Amino acid sequence: MPQTVLNDMEDRMNKAINALKRDLSSLRAGRANPAMLDRVTVDYYGTPTPISQLANISVPEPRMLTIQPWDKTALKEIDRALQQSDLGISPSNDGVIIRLIIPPLTEERRKELVKLAGKGGEEAKVAIRNIRRDANDEIKKLEKAATISEDDSRRHQETIQKTTDKFIAEVDKIVKDKEKDILEV
């Protein structure tokens, strides 16, 4: 029974790490990356649809993304969604393909992005700590129900803490790497 609690905790912590990686991948670091368009949705026939499901996204140059819709009628909708997004990039539409030229980041914008990365890391740490609390509560319930001994309970709580520390260190490393990537000129 306690092993299920530990396995569940580790699965949930892995999901928190994956969510952080997904969120940080959409922060642009001055280079073209198709993942930066993941959060942009297009109103396609009344349904919010990710751009990646409507078009081929490629990186022909380090600072340029091209978006080639499979359905040419979606071109205007994709253009509108890009203009309304928080990317801060103006799309160039030639009627067949949309080009996004990624401008170099200003020092001010880099600092903003570093803060956003740090904030995302903090949110992931809070999520991991909440998962730790839930796991500790489950172990304490098992101890109260006399399913496990007090010694086993302490041992499991120590394991939970070690696992939490490992995941917190991983969050710190991910955020540090992203900050380094953002600050790289």
Curated annotation (Swiss-Prot):
First-listed, main subcellular location of the protein, grouped into a coarse class: cytoplasm
Keywords: Cytoplasm, Protein biosynthesis
GO terms of biological process kind: translational termination
Cell location: Cytoplasm
One matching Pfam family: RRF
Gene3D superfamilies, sorted: 3.30.1360.40, Ribosome-recycling factor (1.10.132.20)
GO terms of molecular function: ribosomal large subunit binding
Gene Ontology terms: cellular component: cytoplasm
Similarity field: Belongs to the RRF family.
General function of this protein: Responsible for the release of ribosomes from messenger RNA at the termination of protein biosynthesis. May increase the efficiency of translation by recycling ribosomes from one round of translation to another.
Protein known as: Ribosome-recycling factor
Organism: Brevibacillus brevis (strain 47 / JCM 6285 / NBRC 100599)
